[in-house]
C-alpha cells in the first residue's frame, strides 16, 4: 500500500494539505509523511529567503510504500519518494530554486535524513518558469 501526502505553500509561506483534510484526520503513518514534507518545505523556504528568490508555487508530494496491503500496526515503510514541484517567474531563478531543493533534500532537512534511516528515499524535481 502507498500512502501519499501533498502539501502546497500559500502566500504566507505556510504549507497546507491539498486534499482538504485537516492534520487531525491523518493516521500516525500519514503524520510522519506530513511532518517530513513540512520540514522539507520550511527548509526550502528558509534557503530561498537567503537568496531573495520568488517562488510562485511550491508543492511537495511525499509517498511512502508500506510492507502490508493496508495500514496496520505491523506496517513498515519499505521506501519513500518525494516530488518537488515549483513555479517561478523568471528563468534565472530556476537554478537558485533547484539548488535550494537539493540542499534541503540532501543536507538540511533533518526529518528527510531520518526517513533515509528507515527506508530508501528517492526524489524528483520539477521547476517551471511561467514567464
What are these regions (language model features)?
Residues 1-35, 42-131:
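Extended beta-strand/beta-hairpin segments
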Amino acid at each position: 500500500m502507498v500512502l501519499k501526502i501533498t502539501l502546497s505553500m500559500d502566500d504566507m509561506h505556510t504549507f497546507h494539505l491539498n486534499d482538504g483534510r485537516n492534520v487531525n484526520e491523518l493516521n500516525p503513518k500519514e503524520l510522519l509523511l506530513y511532518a517530513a514534507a513540512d520540514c522539507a518545505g520550511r527548509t526550502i523556504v528558509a534557503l530561498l529567503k537567503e537568496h531573495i528568490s520568488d517562488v510562485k508555487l511550491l508543492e511537495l508530494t511525499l509517498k511512502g510504500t508500506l510492507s502490508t496491503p493496508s495500514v496496520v500496526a505491523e506496517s513498515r515503510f519499505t521506501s519513500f519518494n518525494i516530488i518537488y514541484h515549483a513555479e517561478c517567474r523568471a528563468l534565472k531563478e530556476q537554478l537558485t530554486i533547484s539548488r535550494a531543493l537539493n540542499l534541503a533534500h540532501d543536507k538540511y532537512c533533518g526529518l528527510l535524513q531520518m526517513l533515509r534511516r528507515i527506508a530508501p528515499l528517492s526524489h524528483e524535481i520539477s521547476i517551471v518558469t511561467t514567464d
